[in-house]
A protein has these predicted regions:
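Nucleotide-activated sugar donor-binding and catalytic core shared by glycosyltransferases
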Residues: 7-10, 43-431
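Active-site-proximal helix-loop elements at catalytic-domain edges
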Residues: 13, 22, 61
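Intrinsic low-complexity, disordered N-terminal segments enriched in polar/charged/small residues
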Residues: 7, 24-30
Length: 431
């Protein structure tokens, strides 16, 4: 019988050759058994009974989500070679083999007041996503961060009877702990990437899965990681002065509210070269309005290389703060938005944690200085940047804090570990 099974398996992923099937039956079966095995083989090879490829629908709404989703997709394809992947995201997801329905640069909206102004657009995007998922009918929908959008999407996915996996928890521990009830109701499996999130969800009796942080993978596997400062300068046509990197974010609102304040530092440090880390979703035209009075170079597609070679960095709050820490470049964390005093009041009212940067949250103490809202001004930026640009106590303490954070994050390989977990969990849903 083992020979028969081996022959049948040959046909699993190939067009059915009926004459050869009959030959197998005649060669390996006799008498009454011949009829039984013929029936079993034809049933096994019938198209509707053959194993269908798994269909994964992935939704990421910003550059960091695009990065993590792309590495997750690579892991899914490694362990499930026939996987079909479709979703909302960016260029990195597309390069990893995902069919992109809508790019995140057309959907990303941030800030309290900006969201209120764009409610109609948000509703239209949710409905478009809804219809596409129903039409494609995936085996699972994997939501990646981007809680404001994805938790709304999760509601109708659940109603449609499609398993909902959440990869990279929305930061409800910072903004809205009340959403835990919603997550418990709508999300079948939660996969978190920060160790403190395991304890957070445990307080609400909601088990989650943790396998490390995918940023460690992305940075560990980055190209040019052995590049020297002089090589980087030569390739990019820079002056050779020490570099101060400006990581101003990947969304237009971030450029509008943060980049102009970062650029006030240019005149204070003539012995350094300021370089903007160009976001993949942006073009020169997006940066041009802010560079009319200052001469600053923009380098696209090399953020890790730039930050690694920089003497210091000014970084918009978010994933980039942790990336900068893993790369061991001293930084000042920057965050601002429209609305002035009103936004600051809303910010202080709704933020539930002591720190906003991931570096400080993971460390459980202040490792990097955070300049938020009204505190993000020229005077404060000058003071904090001056403290870390040269050798000294502040710089040394920050680098030591980075070492603590990196130890807590653990080893590389998280993306593949999460992919394996998801495939195993999904197999349980399929029975």
């Amino acid at each position: 019988m083992s020979l028969l099974v081996g022959q049948v398996n040959f046909f699993q992923d190939k067009p059915i050759d009926l004459p050869r099937v009959r030959g197998i039956c005649n060669r390996y079966t006799y008498g009454y058994g011949k009829l039984v095995y013929r029936f079993q083989i034809f049933f096994y090879l019938c198209p509707k009974n053959r194993k269908k490829p798994m269909k994964y629908y992935v939704i990421a709404g910003e550059a960091s989500g695009d990065l993590h989703a792309s590495n997750l997709i690579k892991g899914l394809r490694k362990f499930d070679s026939g996987a079909e992947v479709r979703g909302w995201g960016g260029d990195l997801m597309r390069e990893s083999g995902c069919e992109i329905v809508r790019h995140y640069k057309d959907t990303a909206i941030m800030g309290f007041l900006t969201v209120l102004k764009n409610l109609d657009k948000i509703k239209a995007n949710i409905e478009a996503c809804h219809q596409d998922i129903l039409a494609w009918r995936p085996d699972v929908v994997i939501l990646v961060d981007y809680g404001g959008f994805n938790l709304r999407v999760a509601k109708f996915i659940k109603e449609a009877g499609i398993p909902v996996f959440y990869y990279i928890s929305p930061k409800i521990w910072a903004w809205n702990t009340g959403r835990v009830k919603k997550i418990k109701r709508l999300v079948d499996r939660m996969f978190v990437i920060f160790p403190f999130e395991v304890d957070f969800y445990a307080r609400y009796d909601y088990p989650v899965q943790y396998a490390g942080n995918p940023l460690v993978d992305a940075i560990h596997d980055r190209p040019f990681k052995d590049e020297t400062f002089n090589e980087f300068v030569r390739v990019n046509g820079l002056s050779g002065k020490p570099i101060i990197a400006l990581v101003a974010g990947s969304r237009s609102q971030e450029l509008k509210h943060v980049l102009p304040k970062m650029l006030t530092m240019v005149k204070h440090f003539p012995g350094h070269e300021f370089v903007i880390a160009g976001a993949p979703s942006m073009s020169d035209a997006d940066y041009a309005p802010y560079l009319q009075d200052v001469k600053v170079k923009i380098i696209y597609g090399q953020t890790y290389r730039l930050v690694r070679q920089a003497r210091a960095a000014l970084v918009t709050s978010g994933t980039a703060t942790l990336e900068t820490a893993i790369l061991r470049t001293p930084q000042v964390v920057c965050y601002s938005g429209e609305g002035g005093a009103l936004s600051y009041f809303l910010f202080k009212t709704f933020v539930k944690v002591k720190y906003i940067s991931l570096v400080n949250l993971i460390a459980g103490r202040e490792v990097v200085t955070e300049l938020l809202m009204q505190k993000l001004n020229e005077k404060n930026l000058l003071r904090e940047l001056s403290l870390i640009i040269s050798e000294g106590e502040k710089r040394d303490q920050m680098l030591a804090g980075y070492d603590e954070v990196n130890e807590k994050l653990g080893d590389a390989g998280a993306s593949e570990r999460f992919a394996r977990m998801m495939i195993d969990e999904l197999s349980r849903f399929r029975g």
